[in-house]
Amino acid sequence: MSKTTRRISTLFAAIALAGAASYSLAAEPIKIALAGPVTGPVAQYGDMQSIGALMAIEQINKAGGVNGSMLEAVTYDDACDPKQAVAVANKIVNDGIRFVVGHLCSGSSQPAADIYNEEGILMITAASTTPELTQKGHTLIFRTIGLDSMQGPTAGNYVVNQLKPKRAAVLHDKQQYGEGIATAVKAALDEANIPVALFEGVTAGDKDFSALIAKMKMEDVDFVYFGGYHPEMGMLLRQSAESNFDARFMGPEGVGNSDISAIAGEASEGMLVTLPKAFDADPKNAHLVEAFKEKKQDPRGAFVFPAYAAVQVMADAMTMSNSQDPEVIAETLRNNSFDTPTGVLEFDEKGDLKNFSFIVYEWHADGSKTALTE
C-alpha cells in the first residue's frame, strides 16, 4: 500500500471514528425522572402526571428532540409518602438523573426538593401547591401550577360572595397540602366574619366519619370545606347523604377527579371544587386532546397539562441555552417566557409562576363539571 493510500485510509478511519463518536453523543438520551404516586390511594394523580409528561416527551422527540438528543422518561413511585419520596430522591441521585418532573403531593415534594437542590438536580412539579416549597431559597425548584395562596382566596371569595353560609366547618387531612389550603380558606371566612364552627383534621385513610358528621349537624353547619384528597372527601359526601346532613361541600383540586364520583355516587352531585382552567377545552390544544384520545387517555385531569408544560419548559430551556446543566437551565427558566398548552408561562426568582388562575367548578355525579367562575 502506498503512503498516499495509507494516508487516505487513515483519514477515512479518523472521520468514521469522529462520526461514530458524534453520533454516540447525539444519541445519548436525556433522562427525566417522573416522580409521583404509582401506587397508593392517590395513584390517579400519578397517572395524570404520567400521561401529560409522556405525551410531551413523545411530541418533542417526534420534532427531533432537544439539541439532537431524545428525551427518555424514568418512572419512580413515591406513593405520595414523604419517607418514600426521600428514598426515591436518593435513588434518582444515585441513578445520575439530573431532571425531575414531580413530585405531586406537597408533603413528598418538600423533602425531595431539599435533596435535589443540594445535589444539583432540576425539579419542576406540576401539582404541589404549598407555598413553603419555594420559600427555602432553592434555585433549582420550579412549578407549573399555582399556589394555595392563590387557590384559597379563590375558594374563599366564592363562598363569601356567592354561597354566604351561616355556619361553616373547615376540615383537613392533617397533611401539608390539605391543612395548608384549609387554613387559607378559613382565613377568608374569618375575614368575612362567617362563623367557623369547626376547624379540625381527620386522619388520611379514615373511612368512618359518622361522629364528625353528627358534630357538624349539632353545630348547624351548612357549608363544609375539606382540604385533602378524594378518598376522604368521597366518604364524607356519601356518609353525609346517608345521615341526611344537608350541607354544601367544597374542596381543592385534590378532590376533583372521577374517582370521587365512584366513591360518593349521587352524593358527589353539586360538590364545589377549585381546579386549574380546563386546558383540554382550549381550541389551541385540540391536536393534543386528539392525541390523548387516540391512546385512550383522559386529558381532563387537573395535572395532565401542567405536567406536559413542565416537560416542555424544561426542554425549551435546554434548547435556548444549548445546555444540559441544571443551573444554566434554571437561569434560563427565570429569564424567559414559554408558550405552552397551559398558556404563556413566566417564573419568578423563587420558581413560582407569575400568573396562574384557579376556577370554581360545580361537580356532577357523572364526573363532568360546570365552571362557575372565569
Predicted segment positions?
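Extracytosolic ligand-binding ectodomains
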Residues: S2-F12, A26-E374
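Gram-negative bacterial Sec-dependent N-terminal signal peptides
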Residues: S9, A18-G19
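Sec/Tat signal peptide C-region and signal peptidase I cleavage site
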Residues: A20-A26
